[in-house]
């Protein structure tokens, strides 16, 4: 079987079996702040209380030999539908560099901002995607500036929905809003038309015009109408923001949106980690298990890659002392990701960490850039030539700006 690279993570050295079908969509459930791998996908029940903390228990999954954290009983019933990467690593313990590594596949520095994977897919789909919704959507907001287009340009950045999916009526801020009447919308479109006189990509203007009009007046806004779902379905996902965002993500994939970023916050648990996890882990368990099961039942799982993880993990050793009171710090040396769908075989564990979870023992997985490797599972070749050209343009612009600034400084000094 030809080596394939995971879309988004693109893990070096990772090779999961895939079938012939290519993925059409990606859903990234991004746990912003960094989830604890020892409490989720790589538990260490024999490592002692300083490692497992308040969660000594593990759950045997429906796949022999695979165990996960005790707070994820629903996910334990479907381990045959997903695989776990237990040895993701980039070594950074800083949020910004961690986000940048996992969202763009590159290390920070060098004066060039690389595009996020969602932006890369949006760029690849620029000529073939004819949907009325944006190609790259974040629920409800992108996790950082690195979700933008980088050197590809801002027209490929994430469209952030805003709003509250868990509310009785979910309204996408500034777009799907019942208070926006036709007159106000026509005024907005008139303002948008005025931008055509500015040096802005006309393709982007046309795209914005069509997308906004369809959002306001077209049938597409019904995709965000969760009242069309039965209460039993909404309860299955959980009434949390994460749960309802995952439900919207399923509806977006059904509508053909290529990339959906579901961002959930609160995972940066330096203090009172276990008190917070008592609520957050059951919410994740409901949301993610319902999403995978729902996609599978609707025949969408094989064509949709589902990924779940954060910018890094958390320290295996619990910080019991004040002021942390049972917290976990940042940890980029070893962390875990869940991968489902898209033709990837389920029921597998990739990599092995040490007994305490502090070191990678087998098959480290590091993020790499999509311009260096093709998004094989997504049916695309590398962006190498395009990326090189655009990086040169970006570097030339940066150099010209620095030279101009130096010139101004020289004039001021004389």
What are the residue ranges of the model-derived segments?
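Positively charged n-region of N-terminal signal peptides that target proteins for export
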Residues: 1-4
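Ligand-binding pockets and gating/stacking loops
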Residues: 19-414
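Bacterial N-terminal signal peptides
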Residues: 7-15
């Amino acid at each position: 079987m030809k080596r394939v690279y995971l879309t988004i993570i693109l893990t070096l050295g990772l090779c999961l079996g895939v079938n012939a079908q290519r993925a059409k969509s990606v859903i990234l459930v991004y746990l912003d702040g960094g989830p604890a791998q020892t409490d989720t996908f790589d538990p260490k029940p024999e490592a002692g209380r300083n490692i497992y903390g308040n969660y000594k228990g593990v759950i045997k999954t429906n796949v022999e030999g695979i165990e996960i954290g005790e707070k994820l009983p629903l996910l334990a019933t479907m381990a045959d539908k997903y695989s776990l990467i237990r040895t993701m690593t980039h070594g950074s313990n800083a949020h910004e560099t961690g986000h940048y590594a996992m969202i763009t596949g590159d290390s920070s520095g060098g004066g060039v901002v690389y595009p996020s994977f969602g932006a890369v897919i949006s760029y690849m789909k620029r000529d073939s995607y004819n949907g009325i919704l944006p190609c790259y959507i974040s629920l409800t907001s992108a996790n950082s500036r690195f979700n933008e287009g980088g050197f590809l340009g801002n027209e490929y950045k994430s469209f952030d929905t805003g709003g509250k999916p868990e509310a009785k009526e979910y309204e996408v801020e500034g777009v799907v809003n019942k208070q926006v009447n036709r007159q106000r919308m026509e005024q907005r479109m008139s303002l948008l038309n005025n931008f055509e006189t500015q040096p802005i990509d006309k393709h982007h203007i046309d795209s914005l015009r069509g997308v906004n009009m369809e959002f306001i007046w077209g049938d597409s806004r019904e995709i965000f109408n969760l009242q069309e779902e039965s209460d039993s379905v909404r309860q299955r996902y959980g009434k949390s923001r994460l749960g309802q965002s995952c439900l919207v993500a399923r509806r977006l994939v059904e509508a053909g949106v290529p990339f959906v970023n579901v961002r959930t916050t609160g995972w940066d648990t330096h203090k009172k980690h276990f008190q917070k996890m008592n609520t957050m882990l059951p919410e994740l368990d409901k949301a993610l298990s319902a999403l995978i099961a729902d996609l599978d039942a609707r025949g969408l799982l094989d064509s949709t890659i589902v990924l779940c993880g954060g910018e890094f993990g958390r320290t295996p050793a619990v910080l019991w002392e004040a002021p942390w009171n049972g917290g976990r710090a940042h940890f980029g040396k070893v962390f875990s990701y869940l991968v489902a769908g898209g033709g990837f075989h389920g029921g597998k564990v990739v990599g092995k960490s040490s007994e305490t979870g502090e070191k990678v023992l087998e098959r480290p997985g590091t993020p790499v850039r999509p311009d260096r490797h093709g998004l094989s599972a997504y049916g695309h070749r590398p962006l190498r030539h395009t990326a090189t050209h655009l990086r040169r343009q970006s570097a030339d612009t940066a150099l010209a700006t620095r030279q101009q600034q130096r010139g101004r400084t020289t004039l001021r000094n004389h």
